[in-house]
Amino acid sequence: MRIGIGYGAYCRGDDYEEGFKKMKSHGYDCVDYGHINNKNSELYKLSSEAFRAYFEKVRESAEKHGIEVWQMHSIWPTVNSDKTETDRQKTTEFFIRQIEAAYYLGCKKFVLHPFLPFGNDVEGDYSFTFQVNVDLLKKLIPHAEKWDVTLCVENLPFRNNPISKVSEVKRLVRTINHPRVKVCLDTGHANIFSSDIASDVRLLGDDLAALHVHDNTGWCDAHKLPYCGKLKWCELLTALGEIGFRGCFNLETAISNDMPEPYREEMRTSLAKLTRSMAEQIK
């Protein structure tokens, strides 16, 4: 099985050449590309030709070093960004541009977060929240088909939000019932709601298409390294094997760039080895 890690764990902004090289040397196969999840990014101001050229260059660099852009991380929800129809339409336009970028990167999995029309951690109106997300996905499906991308809806860490739990994301995806719409399981987010991560995996089954792997104590979205929180890793790996998951075991955690050398290099290498050993247990 492939193993991967987030772009920011090794790369900074447009400085990715050395990052991809190190990523591969430490043992990773894939990257979760996140250098486009800021609405204020200068990349969105590029012409169509320059936009395409930029991401094709990133892809060429990754491929040169043996790294596949397995999945892409979309815009993270922000307070008051999805409250009005105008706000949601603007965000949808960003999603559409990102899906196009995914194609140029050779990326097949586009991870997106549900709309939060009442705020990040506010219950609001369940039916309305659910419906605006159904509408969002239906708008994005034609673009996913055009650019050969699968939309992977991510579960969230907000306790009071109606579409945060794995079960609710599953319901959303089943309501759409389209082969281009699947789920990205964020293990840390799921652990905030339940310690039974294996049941979440089994519930998702064939709808599981991507992973964000990290740990926490069940209290907050801490993005700890595996085995540094309370997530039941053995049960998770067993369940992934049971459902036949054969995608990328992708970390959404990293060794801090502030860690002094040579310890940073040693810890990065060790983390990659640990990740590989975990992926090998998924049978």
Residue map of PLM features:
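Short glycine-enriched, charge-decorated loop/helix-capping segments at active-site entrances
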Residues: 44-49, 85-88, 126-128, 223-228
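N-terminal small/glycine-rich loop or linker at the start of catalytic domains
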Residues: 1-6, 70-81, 116-120
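Glycine-rich, proline-tolerant flexible connector loops at the mouths of alpha/beta enzymes
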Residues: 34-58, 120
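Active-site-proximal loop/turn and secondary-structure-junction residues that shape catalytic pockets
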Residues: 9-11, 35-37, 75-78, 114-118, ...
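A short acidic, helix-capping loop that chelates divalent metal ions and anchors anionic groups
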Residues: 39-44, 78-83, 118-124, 192-193, ...
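Active-site acidic/histidine proton-transfer and metal-coordination neighborhood
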Residues: 56, 61-65, 79-182, 265, ...
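Histidine-acidic metal/acid-base catalytic patches
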Residues: 1-4, 9, 13-29, 92, ...
